[in-house]
Regions:
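Short beta-strand segments
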Residues: 16-49, 55-57, 63-67
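Short, structured beta-strand-loop surface elements
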Residues: 50-117
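Short, cationic low-complexity segments
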Residues: 97, 123-128
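Charged, amphipathic alpha-helical segments
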Residues: 2-6, 47, 85
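Extreme N-terminal tail/first-helix region
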Residues: 1-19, 123
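Short, flexible, glycine/charge-rich loop motifs used to bind or transfer phosphoryl groups or to couple energy/partner
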Residues: 8-9, 33, 92
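Intrinsically disordered, low-complexity segments enriched in polar/charged residues with Gly/Pro
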Residues: 6-10, 21-24, 50-51, 96-98
Length: 128
């Protein structure tokens, strides 16, 4: 991937503090807004331990994330409690003790136009 495209994606991921997570699986199609924080190209979300999203992720790790500024497709991984030594501000959110950390490894990001509708640019983050 070109350095400028990677940097553009990293900058876009840093902006939102919340993102809508969309999953599908045995619990059906699920969409919910959760707190998030990025480290480099990895995006971390706090998802309640009782969420149907986690059940879906156990069966299918493909996810889509949405914010006002971008749409992202990627692979999610549930990080078991106590396993991570990440220093995330996200872990200090109110109610974080009732949540599980989910890491999303992005495959593709579509940055939206600031005015109007549609996408301004698409960045492929993985080459398959």
């Amino acid at each position: 991937m070109l350095d400028y495209a990677r940097q553009r994606a990293i900058e876009a991921l840093k902006i939102p503090r919340r993102a809508v997570l969309a999953t599908s699986g045995p619990a059906g199609i699920q969409a919910g807004e959760f707190p998030c924080e990025a480290i480099d190209l990895d995006l971390y979300l706090l998802v309640p331990k009782t969420s149907d999203h986690l059940f879906n992720l156990e069966h299918d790790s493909n996810v889509t994330l949405l914010t006002a500024g971008w749409q992202l497709k990627g692979q999610a991984q549930i990080i078991p409690p106590g396993v991570s030594d990440l220093r995330l501000d996200l872990l200090r959110e109110q109610g974080a003790e009732w949540c599980v950390l989910v890491r999303v490894d992005p495959c593709q990001m579509q940055i939206r136009r600031e005015e109007g509708w549609g996408n301004l640019e698409t960045i492929d983050l993985k080459s398959y």
